[in-house]
Amino acid sequence: MDKQMLFVYNPKAGKAQIRSNLLDIIDTFVKAGYEVTAYPTQAPGDAVKAVQERRAGYDMVVCSGGDGTLDEVVTGMMKSEERLPIGYVPAGSTNDFANSLKIPKSMLQAADVVVNGRTFACDVGKFNYNIFIYVAAFGIFTDVSYGTPQDTKNVLGHAAYLIEGVRRLPSVRSYPLKITCNGEVIEGEFLYGMVTNSHSVGGFRGITGQNVALDDGLFEVTLIRKPTNPLDINNIIRALVDKRVKSEHIYTFTTEKLKVESEEPMAWTLDGEFGGDHQSVVIESWHRALEIRVPDETE
């Protein structure tokens, strides 16, 4: 009897690449012994619902789209009692998590990894009652991904995120915060903060720290303190471009859990999508909670 696969895909992700590759991708799955049920998402949040309601009776769930689509599929799986391995065929404009896992950019090669690769257990982030895969962030740049028009993302790729972020510099605001982690309390005004489990964010590698492991139960945390003048802002941008993750205004550390409190509700982004306004959040690592298909050579 053939193995059963639920294939959830976003037909609009990236440059709608899935349209020209869909039949070949499904053919790859079928030749590997899977009976495939294809489900094109119709609206934001649709993939969460599809996985929760339809996963029963399947051996694997595969998704194709950007990081947002993967986030929805993982969220649906993590909220289910029975968890299945997940395959990922990237089709977005910036696929940070796929890059960290060395999943090929070629959709057909990624489909081959789904059926011929190996299963890797990696960490998943909890954000209050929500779930994220590789980044939770606030402040400057955090609304760039969901605030950048889809057409711009498609044409410019991850350069679109940097362009949009730089455009917003004149209106930068800071946030008075209290951050509790590792038995310490950090207080101050911050321009930006990100809690990551990835080798890259926004398509830029090396800005999340050194020796990053996706299955060690630890987040890499980066905080950028409030600059006092335009020169400080330039120095911060230069440090990020040069991948100097520790400087006068940039504070980094690792932790498995932290609490972030602000004086008023603050906008967060989860995996590049709007994560809501929150005044108090607890972020913790769900150690090796996600089983995902990766190439054999991925360590």
Describe the function of each predicted region:
Residues 47, 67, 193:
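Short conserved active-site loop signatures built around small residues
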Residues 152-159, 200, 205, 209-229:
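Gly/Ser/Thr-rich active-site loops/lids in small-molecule metabolic enzymes
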Residues 137, 194-210, 274:
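Glycine-rich phosphate/pyrophosphate-binding beta-alpha loops
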Residues 69-81:
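Short Gly/Thr/Asp-enriched flexible loops that form oxyanion-binding sites at enzyme active sites
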Residues 181, 187, 213, 223-299:
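ATP/nucleoside-binding phosphotransfer catalytic cores, i.e., glycine-rich phosphate-binding loops
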Residues 1-64, 299:
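ATP/NTP phosphate-donor binding region
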Residues 32, 41, 79-195:
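Catalytic core of DAGKc-family lipid kinases
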